[in-house]
């Protein structure tokens, strides 16, 4: 989906080479994020992304002098532009990419921008900011379409429609490289042998489906190494979520039949699978094998649970993605439904960034090209609005998929009903987001009034750290703004300093803030809009909130003063006596402490910010701790020798199940006393600071 080596790049209006998108970002001074992993948590709440920032619509007309300069740069480009297909990039004087477009005839398209009249305000503003034009020639218009989508996603130009929060979709994989196939969730490249089923809209949907599939088909979910090490069935066999092929509880033909049934169900032959199970249940009952009949009954119930979770399932559509777009209040929402093998595998709402002057058809057309830039398309794509160049898009996607892809806007029948259902969801999702945004804006105004800020903060960063007696220490930053929590900009910081005293919360906070603000100070492109859209690092916060008391505030203030920062406002939030919510104390530099009424909406808002930071940092800490526990096994549990370790593993099967066990369950293990059970439970459930 990128241009090949035969493409020719021409630099118009500048002596610099065009370079790759990554090169262009490096040239603008944007370094890759080094600090942290932004994808530390997967939740269903991520399915609806935040509303994008809308570029301000100017009231006055664009000044004639900048327009004339921009047209001159474009006219210069026209004289050297090819009449063949290609992609062009409008760039400002700072080398930021303003717009990426494609054309069947590049010279003709650029000529339309050089006309002195007839431009809409959005185009006029873009022309006025243009200082140079870059052109990449392509062999065909289809190549130009694919390259345009790729560049928009990478460069995030200001005047393009931008697909936001486009994380990869999860799949279900039934492996094909082991005699006893495994059932698991999969993201990323589909390189492992086996059958892939998806995409699913969220990790939560996949997790629920896999759990139900285990109950219905008893296919294993353990790793191959764990499978090979078993001498007795694990807990999943005991609770009837695995057939136990690892220890011969089921033979090869029997397990193969279960895998085939699971594959058939995921492939759309669910009715036949359910009929076979119903017949087997009736036969077992007739043979007075009531325990076996009950097993078939439970498997049928698990299949029914899967289908009830899926909601609407089409009768005549086997494989399709359904897109519907709704516009309201200057914002757009695109709702996407995924149908595979006649089953609804979930939906997701997107809120693309686009100026108000774009039409829904324009936004949807650009959205689709970017959406399938890194995803395999289905054979049928159903749309709520007719888009320009739908045939060109279908041709490009057909080449990508290796089969014919149809892009259609249905007018009647079940396909029309599916689109209408998606449109209803788009309308409701955007309504919820607009309501949430209005509430958020009022709360930010109240926060600004409380703190004496000149205007409501557009970016609030909240910091917290977590550890257990200094071990697995981690700091975290969450971000909030007028659109709510910006989860794609959350960051975590593994505490690195070897000189830090274990458990020194103030030193941990200083390290986190120093790393964050020093990175901001070293960013050469802090004011680059493209960089700000790409990454959180170049964006300065208007307000920093610390989870802690006066000591944490002083630690943060020391960092800010040492770095000479005057633009960042600080506040610390200390929990009330007995850590009661509603009795918090707010600490500000050089001001008396503030205590708000328990029912004050602004206090509730501050609590939400603080609690979200706490949730995120605790999750990050637990991931580090679980990793250490997995690597160390039960060796680190005090008072647990080899005999008790074997007893625990024999009883529960896996370390994960031991970690999940209740105190009462641990006490049932032979050789484990009440005192040992308490010690084990406390080890796995120690509360981080």
UniProtKB/Swiss-Prot annotation:
Name of this chain's protein: UvrABC system protein C
Extent of Polar residues compositional bias: 1-19
GO biological process: nucleotide-excision repair; SOS response
CDD domains according to UniProt: GIY-YIG_UvrC_Cho (cd10434)
Keywords, alphabetical: Cytoplasm, DNA damage, DNA excision, DNA repair, Excision nuclease, SOS response
Biased composition (Acidic residues): 42-59
Gene3D superfamilies xrefs: 5' to 3' exonuclease, C-terminal subdomain, GIY-YIG endonuclease, UVR domain, UvrC, RNAse H endonuclease domain
Protein function: The UvrABC repair system catalyzes the recognition and processing of DNA lesions. UvrC both incises the 5' and 3' sides of the lesion. The N-terminal half is responsible for the 3' incision and the C-terminal half is responsible for the 5' incision.
Species classification: Bacteria, Pseudomonadati, Pseudomonadota, Alphaproteobacteria, Hyphomicrobiales
Domain GIY-YIG: 83-161
Domain UVR, residue spans: 271-306
Name of the coding gene: uvrC
GO cellular component, one term: excinuclease repair complex
Cysteines paired by S-S bonds: none
């Amino acid at each position: 989906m990128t241009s090949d080596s035969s493409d020719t790049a021409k630099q118009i209006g500048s002596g610099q080479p065009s370079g790759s998108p990554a090169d262009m970002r490096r040239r603008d001074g944007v370094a890759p994020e080094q600090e942290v992993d932004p994808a530390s948590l997967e939740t269903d709440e991520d399915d609806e992304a935040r509303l994008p920032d809308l570029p301000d619509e100017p009231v006055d007309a664009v000044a004639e002098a900048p327009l004339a300069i921009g047209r001159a740069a474009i006219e210069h480009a026209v004289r050297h532009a090819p009449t063949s297909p290609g992609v062009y990039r409008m760039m400002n004087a700072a080398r930021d990419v303003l717009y990426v477009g494609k054309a069947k005839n590049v010279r003709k398209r650029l000529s339309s921008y050089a006309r002195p009249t007839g431009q809409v305000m959005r185009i006029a503003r873009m022309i006025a900011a243009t200082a140079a034009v870059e052109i990449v020639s392509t062999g065909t218009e289809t190549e130009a379409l694919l390259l345009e989508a790729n560049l928009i996603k990478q460069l995030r130009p200001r005047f393009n429609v931008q697909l936001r929060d486009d994380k990869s979709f999860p799949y279900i994989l039934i492996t094909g490289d082991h005699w006893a196939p495994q059932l698991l969730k999969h993201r990323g490249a589909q390189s492992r042998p086996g059958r892939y089923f998806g995409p699913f809209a969220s990790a939560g949907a996949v997790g629920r489906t896999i759990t139900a599939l285990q109950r219905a088909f008893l296919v294993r979910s353990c790793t191959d190494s764990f499978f090979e090490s078993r001498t007795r069935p694990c807990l999943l066999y005991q609770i009837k979520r695995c057939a136990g092929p690892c220890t011969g509880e089921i033979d090869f033909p029997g397990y193969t039949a279960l895998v085939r049934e699971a594959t058939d169900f995921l492939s759309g032959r669910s009715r036949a699978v359910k009929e076979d199970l119903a017949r087997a249940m009736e036969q077992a009952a007739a043979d007075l094998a009531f325990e076996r009949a009950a097993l078939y009954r439970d498997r049928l119930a698990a299949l029914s649970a899967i289908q009830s979770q899926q909601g609407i399932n089409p009768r005549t559509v086997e494989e399709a993605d359904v897109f519907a777009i709704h516009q309201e209040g200057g914002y757009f929402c695109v709702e996407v439904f995924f149908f595979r093998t006649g089953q609804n595998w979930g939906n997701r709402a997107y809120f693309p960034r686009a100026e108000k002057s774009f039409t829904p058809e324009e936004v949807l057309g650009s959205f689709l090209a970017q959406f399938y830039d890194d995803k395999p398309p289905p054979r049928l794509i159903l749309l709520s609005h007719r888009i320009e160049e739908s045939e060109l898009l279908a041709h490009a996607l057909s080449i990508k998929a290796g089969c014919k892809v149809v892009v259609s806007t249905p007018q009647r029948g079940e396909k029309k009903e599916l689109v209408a259902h998606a449109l209803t969801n788009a309308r409701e999702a955007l309504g919820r987001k607009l309501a949430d945004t209005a509430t958020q804006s009022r709360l930010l105004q109240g926060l600004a009034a409380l703190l004496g800020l000149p205007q409501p903060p557009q970016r609030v960063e909240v910091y917290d750290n977590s550890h257990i007696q200094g071990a697995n220490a981690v700091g975290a930053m969450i971000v909030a703004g007028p659109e709510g929590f910006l989860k794609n900009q959350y960051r975590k910081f593994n505490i690195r300093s070897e000189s830090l005293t274990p458990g020194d919360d103030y030193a941990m906070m200083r390290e986190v803030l120093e790393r964050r603000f020093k990175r901001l100070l070293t960013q050469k492109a802090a004011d680059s809009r493209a960089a700000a859209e790409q990454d959180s690092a170049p964006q300065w916060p208007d307000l920093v909130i610390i989870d802690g008391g006066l000591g944490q505030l002083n630690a943060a203030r020391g960092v800010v003063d040492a770095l000479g920062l005057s633009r960042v406002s600080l506040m610390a939030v200390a929990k009330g006596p007995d850590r009661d919510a509603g009795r918090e104390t707010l600490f500000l530099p050089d001001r008396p402490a503030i205590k708000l009424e328990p029912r004050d909406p602004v206090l509730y808002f501050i609590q939400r910010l603080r609690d979200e930071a706490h949730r995120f940092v605790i999750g990050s800490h637990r991931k580090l701790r679980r990793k250490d526990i997995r690597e160390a096994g039960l060796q680190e549990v005090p008072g647990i020798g080899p005999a008790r370790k074997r007893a625990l593993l024999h009883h529960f099967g896996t370390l994960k199940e031991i970690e999940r066990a209740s105190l009462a369950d641990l006490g049932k293990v032979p050789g484990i006393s009440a005192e040992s059970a308490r010690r084990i439970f406390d080890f796995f459930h120690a509360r981080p600071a």
